[in-house]
Amino acid sequence: MGTTGLESLSLGDRGAAPTVTSSERLVPDPPNDLRKEDVAMELERVGEDEEQMMIKRSSECNPLLQEPIASAQFGATAGTECRKSVPCGWERVVKQRLFGKTAGRFDVYFISPQGLKFRSKSSLANYLHKNGETSLKPEDFDFTVLSKRGIKSRYKDCSMAALTSHLQNQSNNSNWNLRTRSKCKKDVFMPPSSSSELQESRGLSNFTSTHLLLKEDEGVDDVNFRKVRKPKGKVTILKGIPIKKTKKGCRKSCSGFVQSDSKRESVCNKADAESEPVAQKSQLDRTVCISDAGACGETLSVTSEENSLVKKKERSLSSGSNFCSEQKTSGIINKFCSAKDSEHNEKYEDTFLESEEIGTKVEVVERKEHLHTDILKRGSEMDNNCSPTRKDFTGEKIFQEDTIPRTQIERRKTSLYFSSKYNKEALSPPRRKAFKKWTPPRSPFNLVQETLFHDPWKLLIATIFLNRTSGKMAIPVLWKFLEKYPSAEVARTADWRDVSELLKPLGLYDLRAKTIVKFSDEYLTKQWKYPIELHGIGKYGNDSYRIFCVNEWKQVHPEDHKLNKYHDWLWENHEKLSLS
């Protein structure tokens, strides 16, 4: 292996070795005359290569061949899974979705030697049947996918032996690569699970830090993987952990050590001193607390509120003493989280009490606005002498004990409709216009309105019965209804369920029954001029009222076919009938 980075790992004699690309590639030792622009261009090229990284399964007929899970350019995690072989010339590709509602789901498809993709076993079977393939069967193609946990465990078993074997060979590499990378990745580097491993990573090579990153990823497991969201900058994926790259920050951090050898040494020393607190801070910002090495696999989720408290506490501690901040953000994360939880609970109780006091003060102020002026004066004097909690209690007690004259309440709240004087009187008749009373002439059409014109309520009830119903069905039920409920006073007090039983031969009997009861009540109580203002009466009922009950047939333009016939007949015979 060269010093340019860990490109691939040999997995022994298990078959074709899958390619495992590190999410962070090592930069070779630059010469002394390396310029600032060259370093920036190299880092940018490395990021683009890693972003477009894809692992595919090789098309060899090896029964022990391991199958890598492909990583799409839009973002899919790469891993390996040990499976049976696929037919010669075919490729099996597995992609995992990282975004959307189906994040974490695996898509399996096979690529034929001709380059055709098959995403389901049915389409593959149709293809084989169409081409007359006899050597291949749909059962030879496996569309199932192992779980991510199983894939990780197999990858760990296959790769850890090779990782430990190459660990000794990489320990003699230069420390400049590690320090350069820790400086460039200051904002995005994930720390080891304990302070002892962090000290070991300083002395080891770049490969050692990559090994520690792989161990950390096993502790995080599927929790971080399912929380992947597309960031604004470039993102490289290493076993499901998103690492955001900021080119500007990387170039800015690299600008200090590429000018001269003396400055490079000072920056490297500074990177060693700052690597631990910066790594801990980036870990806290990711809202995942990784416990000590003894409790591997357990993760502590940090909420957004706790994260804000952590930031505030770090600022205060850093202003006081740097030693205290490093001690708080180092390996003792469990104690820090417990202290942080207690502080969060205290602050939450304080804010809750403050919000309660503010809410009670607002209620008391609103209630006091309705009190008499002398009560307000006494209440304000007592409020000045009392504490905030006793102020609220005193204001509520005054509001409950002191009484206001009944006349003021009636004058303010009670309307004229509900006053006692109005209730003692009988129901006032509707104040209609002083229409000219007239008797509509009998026509050859024999409409029911010609019989009920003398009682507007009965005529309007008939229009409700005839609405979207034939006269043969509605008129017999109408006479039964008028026998049981002869007036509006009786109908307004009737139970709508009884009326509904009577109207069952007609459609919409429940709706008609409720409409009749409410219409009868408004007919007696509401001040109306035309019946279209009442509940349940439309244009048909209003036109019938104006033609048969009121002498306004000349101003009416009916739309009902029966009313149209009667209206036309009136216009043709109004001179013979001496109608004005």
Swiss-Prot record:
Which Gene Ontology terms of cellular component type are present?
Answer: nuclear speck; nucleoplasm; nucleus
Q: Which GO terms describe its biological process?
A: depyrimidination; DNA repair; response to estradiol
Tell me the segments the record calls region Disordered. 1-36
The EC number of this protein is 3.2.2.-
Keywords in alphabetical order, please: Disease variant, DNA damage, DNA repair, DNA-binding, Hydrolase, Nucleus, Phosphoprotein
Positions modified as Phosphoserine?
A: S318, S428
The record's listing under InterPro entries reads: DNA-bd_dom_sf, DNA_glycosylase, MBD4, MeCP2/MBD4, Methyl_CpG_DNA-bd
What are the subcellular locations of this protein?
Nucleus
UniProt disease link: Tumor predisposition syndrome 2: An autosomal recessive condition characterized by predisposition to develop a variety of tumors or malignancies, including acute myeloid leukemia, myelodysplastic syndrome, colorectal adenomatous polyposis and carcinoma, and uveal melanoma.
Question: Assembly and partners?
Answer: Interacts with MLH1.
Which protein are we looking at? Methyl-CpG-binding domain protein 4
